[in-house]
Amino acid sequence: MAESQIQSYTINFGPQHPAAHGVLRLILEMSGEVVDRADPHVGLLHRGTEKLIEHKTYLQATPYFDRLDYVGTMNQEHAFVLATEKLLGIDIPIRAKFIRTLYDEIGRILNHLLNVTAFIFDVGGMTPLLYGFEEREKLMEFYERVCGARLHANYYRPGGVAADLPAGLLEDIAAWCETFPKVLDDIETLATDNRIFKQRVVDIGVVSPEQALDWGFTGPNLRASGIAWDLRKSQPYDVYDQMEFDIPVGKNGDGYDRYLVRVLEMRESVKIMKQCIAKMPGGPVRVEDNKITPPKRSEMKTSMESLIHHFKLFTEGFKVPAGEVYGAIEAPKGEFAVYLVSDGTGKPYRCKIRPPGYVHLQALDMMSKGHMLADVVANIGSIDIVFGEIDR
């Protein structure tokens, strides 16, 4: 009897595949069920964000950052307003720094909750996804109460934040911080020691520390490979230098470690949120310079100068001194950065966005070689990609 030949063929994975997490199109070259090459095709969600920003004032450019990684939105705004503030040479009030730090961590939990539970869902576990969405709903309510929007917040502004926290909000966030670890315990009970889950993700998509650095990994994907690099510790911004927290680090660099690092990061985020609430100082939430931030409504009703400031701010925007600056933050997915070039006018000359997901997606081929087709799905879930920021 003639021995059967393993047939090599090419298949399209996505862009409308439920496990593709958006509009990912993968061209998979297969030998039987084994992947020889995974070629990601990006650009299906390209909206020309960087070019649009060049035609907008700095204030009008901020909302575009919500639409990049649309899972935890305020973190992206943070990188842009930090870069703008560096160019302006201003220091924002301490209360605004605490509010930003608090909402950065809420964004981190929003992101990890979706990723961890969707990752478990990708490999066959449905229940955690329902738990995760219930908690995300509560967090989005905190977004809504502070700025009126559940997702596209546009809350951080150059010079501080858009508005102060409403009465009673901090108490409600503190109450949520007490109940949330129990939900994490429930998710971990279902997944962490689950035999089926571990068989799907342990030793799948292993990335060594050297490979992680060579490919430019950042964030949880880098830490899962055993490198304790976190911008909140190494280059602290706002009030992270006043916060006590640990950096969870994996040791195998596989899908399971990436999952564990994110779960532990959520626990650390709750710690940071509690400290922000406990230490939250009083005072203003925006710089008092009306050349940069709008005057109070009450002043505009009585003062002609305030009205002029307001009109100038929202028609031509504030002028930013010429120069270039790189502003980076530790976003939930990794190092999100903005390279901002100003030519001294009210609009950015160039705004290069450095998304973490773009780098991680490049490594998908390296991670999936020699694995089965079903493991590609597990790899996509474990590196946490969102196409808003990859395609921009």
UniProtKB/Swiss-Prot annotation:
| EC number in record | 7.1.1.-
Localized where? Answer: Cell inner membrane
Coiled-coil spans in chain: none
Instruction: Give the catalysed reaction(s), semicolon-separated.
Output: a quinone + NADH + 5 H(+)(in) = a quinol + NAD(+) + 4 H(+)(out)
- One cellular-component annotation, GO: plasma membrane
Q: Which SUPFAM superfamilies match?
A: HydB/Nqo4-like
Q: Which UniProt keywords apply?
A: Cell inner membrane, Cell membrane, Membrane, NAD, Quinone, Translocase, Transport, Ubiquinone
Q: Say which enzyme class the record assigns.
A: translocase
UniProt keyword Cell membrane present: yes
What is the superkingdom listed in this entry's lineage?
Bacteria
Which Gene Ontology molecular-function terms are recorded?
NAD binding; NADH:ubiquinone reductase (non-electrogenic) activity; quinone binding
> What residue intervals traverse the membrane?
none
Q: How does it sit in the membrane?
A: Peripheral membrane protein
Pfam name, any one: Complex1_49kDa
Q: What does this protein do?
A: NDH-1 shuttles electrons from NADH, via FMN and iron-sulfur (Fe-S) centers, to quinones in the respiratory chain. The immediate electron acceptor for the enzyme in this species is believed to be ubiquinone. Couples the redox reaction to proton translocation (for every two electrons transferred, four hydrogen ions are translocated across the cytoplasmic membrane), and thus conserves the redox energy in a proton gradient.
Family assignment? Belongs to the complex I 49 kDa subunit family.
Record note on quaternary structure: NDH-1 is composed of 14 different subunits. Subunits NuoB, C, D, E, F, and G constitute the peripheral sector of the complex.
Record-linked NCBIfam families: NuoD, PRK06075.1
Q: What is this protein called?
A: NADH-quinone oxidoreductase subunit D
Tell me what organism the protein belongs to. Paramagnetospirillum magneticum (strain ATCC 700264 / AMB-1) (Magnetospirillum magneticum)
